[in-house]
A protein has these predicted regions:
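Conserved metal-binding segment of the jelly-roll/cupin
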Residues: 61-74, 90
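Short beta-strand His + acidic residue motifs that chelate non-heme Fe in jelly-roll/DSBH
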Residues: 51-53, 75-81
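A hydrophobic/aromatic-rich effector-binding and dimerization subdomain
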Residues: 2-14, 80-139
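Generic protein-terminus/edge-of-domain signal
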Residues: 1-62
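Short hydrophobic/aromatic patch on the recognition helix
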Residues: 64, 217-218
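Short, Lys/Arg-enriched, Trp-marked, Pro/Gly-tolerant hinge/linker segments that flank
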Residues: 121-122, 144-151, 161-191, 195-210, ...
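Amphipathic, well-ordered alpha-helical segments in soluble domains
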Residues: 41-44, 129-133, 155, 159-162
Length: 228
């Protein structure tokens, strides 16, 4: 991908309803008030600043910063500066699920971790890597390859694995814990959320799927948060 810091023309490339790639996007496809997002977003800030909140964490986006948002998070976006521009990818919940399906085991604690670890400042070396990475994805979206969806999924999976690897390293420094019955339930709970969060947001629905009470599931979720 060419350096677009001095270009302002908005470019949009799509892959059906699954994937949208925006170059030089100023206003992120988010509301100015906290709302539950249905898609995953990967945002790279080219220049300028803007305010973003994920759950209760507020952050001012800076130039050369990578923002990672996951489906189901409560997010708001506001106050972009006059010169704010981004490269933004919007990934459907279906495609996001397919990207994670190739990962051996995503701990549910990772999703809590990402509530406060969603922005990543990039150094000079990182910026070159990010431009190469974004360029590969853009090339695949624009191509006529028969398996371009699968190729994009693999590229997305690479990024999510890098994030999960960083999370695991940090977790190991804090605690070396074995899987327990509660953690196994938490894993299953988050798998169900990925499948059903659009149509079901009631704890009772997930408790019924797991054959436990709503009260016990709430306790399991609280324990998961305590580990993050």
């Amino acid at each position: 991908m060419q350096n677009n810091k001095n270009k302002e023309t908005l470019e949009i490339y799509v892959l059906g309803d699954d994937f949208k790639y925006y170059e030089n996007l100023k206003y992120l496809p988010l509301t100015s008030y906290p709302s539950n997002i249905q898609s995953a977003l990967i945002v790279y800030s080219l220049r300028g600043t803007a305010k973003i909140s994920v759950h209760e964490d507020v952050h001012w986006i800076q130039p050369d910063e990578l923002i990672i948002l996951l489906p189901g998070q409560f997010v708001s976006f506001s106050e972009p500066s006059e010169d704010f521009l981004t490269v933004t990818m919007v990934i459907s919940s279906s495609m996001f699920g397919d990207a994670l399906s190739g990962v051996p085991r995503f701990s549910p604690h990772f999703f809590f971790y990402m509530r406060s670890h969603y922005y990543y400042p990039q150094n000079e070396r990182d910026v070159l890597r990010i431009y190469n990475y974004l360029g590969m994805i853009k090339d695949k979206v624009m191509s006529t390859d028969a398996y371009r969806r699968e190729l994009i999924i693999h590229l997305l999976r690479y990024l999510y694995l890098e994030l999960f690897n960083a999370y695991e390293k940090e977790s190991m420094l804090v605690n070396t814990r074995k899987d327990t019955r509660k953690e196994e339930l938490a894993n299953k709970f988050f798998s169900l959320i990925m499948k059903h969060f659009k149509e079901n947001k009631d704890v009772a629905f997930y408790a019924d799927k797991l054959c436990i009470t709503s009260k016990y599931l709430t306790m399991v979720i609280k324990i998961g948060r305590a580990h993050v």
